UniProtKB/Swiss-Prot annotation:
Its EC number is 1.7.1.13. It comes from Methylobacillus flagellatus (strain ATCC 51484 / DSM 6875 / VKM B-1610 / KT). The lineage of its organism: Bacteria, Pseudomonadati, Pseudomonadota, Betaproteobacteria, Nitrosomonadales. The keyword Repeat does not apply. It is an enzyme of class 1 (oxidoreductase). One of its GO terms (cellular component) is cytoplasm. InterPro entries: GTP-CH-I_C/QueF, NADPH_dep_7-cyano-7-deazaG_red, QueF, QueF_type1. Pfam families: QueF (PF14489). This is NADPH-dependent 7-cyano-7-deazaguanine reductase.
């Protein structure tokens, strides 16, 4: 697999297609260029989805996200483009992409875009106690 930016998203078979489960990813190094000024824009992307038959492969996702580094994109457009491309690649039951852009001109921009497969209904939510820290880092 390449180590250069790429628009190709790879997938693998969902190991448990009979169960709805939630995949959460945090992508802290998204960059693109402001189409007006050419200045870099930075964001943290949060990808949440419930897969159907396919899951997105992580290295291809990293290279795909990297491919926007030198592209001029409005925040709203790039968030929706990424969601659309991920939906085409994986055909999930549900997918939400949240893009939290760093401050620009004194304004923080958050864009949330969602996809829901027609006819899919989520299971009722089960409320569980939260752990003190949801971090993957132990210390």
């Amino acid at each position: 697999m390449s180590s250069q930016p790429s628009k190709a998203l790879e997938t693998f078979d969902n190991p448990t297609p009979g169960r709805d489960f939630h995949i959460h990813m945090e992508i802290p190094e998204f960059t693109c260029l402001c189409p007006k000024t050419g200045q870099p824009d930075f964001a943290v992307l949060y990808l949440d989805y419930i897969p159907d038959q396919k899951c997105v492969e992580l290295k291809s996702l990293k290279l795909y996200i990297w491919s926007f580094r030198d592209e001029g994109c409005f925040h709203e457009a790039v968030t929706n483009q990424i969601l659309d491309d991920l939906v085409v690649a994986t055909d999930p039951k549900f997918m939400r992409l949240t893009a939290k852009f760093y401050v620009r001109g004194g304004i923080f921009t958050n864009v949330v875009a969602e996809h829901r497969k027609p006819g899919w209904q989520p299971q009722p939510r089960v409320e569980l106690a939260e752990f003190e820290s949801q971090s993957n880092i132990r210390g």
